[in-house]
A protein has these predicted regions:
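A short, conserved acidic/glycine-rich loop-to-beta-strand motif
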Residues: 5-15
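Intrinsically disordered, low-complexity segments enriched in polar/charged residues with Gly/Pro
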Residues: 4-5, 37, 75, 138
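Conserved nucleotide-sugar donor-binding catalytic segment
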Residues: 13-14, 19-111
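Acidic donor-binding/catalytic loop of UDP-sugar-dependent glycosyltransferases
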Residues: 1
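C-terminal subregions of glycosyltransferases and related glycan-biosynthesis enzymes
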Residues: 44, 61-62, 71-72, 76-77, ...
Length: 212
C-alpha cells in the first residue's frame, strides 16, 4: 500500500489480545480510526502492526522533538502527527498478538496509575489541538476524558478515589452520555457508603449482643 499510494503515510492492522494473568486470548485491538479527529479522541492503533514511511518518522522527530516532551507514550503522539500531516491505511485483519500484563503504563490495577495515564493522554491531545489549531475538537476530547474518569469511579474501589470526588464536582458535562456517567458514579458511591454504614451497624449490634 505504501508503494502504491504516495498519499498514505502509514499502515496498521488488528491484533488479538492475550491476557498474561489469565493466560487466555480475549478480544482485539485495532479499529478503522484513521482520521486525525478520531485518533485525537482515542488511540486505536496497535504499535506492533504499524509500518510508516522513513521520511515521515525523521521529520516527526525533527519537528516535534518527542524526547523533550514529558509524555508517557511514545507512539500515540506520532500517530496523531502522521494522521494530521498524511494518511493512515487500516488493514482489517489480525497480524499479531498483543500481550497485556497485570501492570504496565496503559494497564494497571492502581487508580493513581490509571489517572496518570489518562492525564498523559490528555496532555498529548491538548498539545496536538494547539499544534493543529483544531480548537473545535477541545470539547470532544474533554467529554471523552471525563467519561473515562467516571468509568474509573464506577469500576474501582470508591474509598481509594474519594480524594478525586472534588474534581468531579467541578465538571459540567454537556453530552447525555457524560451526564449519565456522572449520575451513575455519584449513585454508586452513595450506595457503597450506605453499605459500609449498614455493615458497621450490624457489627456494632453483634458486638453488643456478644457482650451482654
Amino acid at each position: 500500500m505504501l508503494e502504491k499510494k504516495i498519499e498514505i503515510g502509514g499502515v496498521y492492522s488488528r491484533v488479538q489480545c492475550y491476557f498474561q494473568g489469565h493466560r487466555k486470548f480475549e478480544g482485539y485491538i485495532g479499529k478503522d480510526y484513521i482520521s486525525f479527529e478520531n485518533l485525537l479522541r482515542e488511540n486505536t492503533i496497535p504499535t506492533l502492526t504499524v509500518l510508516i514511511r522513513k521520511e515521515l518518522l525523521l521529520k516527526y522527530i525533527e519537528e516535534i522533538k518527542p524526547e523533550r516532551q514529558n509524555w508517557e507514550m511514545g507512539d500515540y503522539p506520532m500517530w496523531l502527527w502522521i494522521a494530521y500531516k498524511s494518511k493512515f491505511y487500516f488493514m482489517n485483519e489480525i497480524t499479531g498478538v498483543y500481550r497485556i500484563l497485570n501492570e504496565s503504563v496503559s494497564h494497571s490495577d492502581s487508580v493513581d496509575r490509571h489517572i496518570e495515564f489518562y492525564n498523559s493522554c490528555r496532555d498529548i491531545q491538548h498539545y496536538f489541538i494547539d499544534y493543529s489549531h483544531r480548537f473545535d475538537l477541545l470539547n470532544w476530547v474533554e467529554e471523552y476524558y471525563n467519561s473515562r474518569m467516571y468509568q474509573l469511579c464506577l469500576e474501582q474501589n470508591y474509598i481509594e478515589i474519594k480524594s478525586y470526588r472534588d474534581y468531579f464536582k467541578t465538571i459540567k458535562p454537556t453530552s447525555f452520555k457524560t451526564k449519565m456517567f456522572k449520575i451513575s458514579a455519584n449513585y454508586r458511591i452513595c450506595e457503597y457508603l450506605m453499605k459500609i454504614c449498614l455493615q458497621n451497624i450490624f457489627i456494632r449490634k453483634l458486638y453488643n449482643n456478644i457482650n451482654k
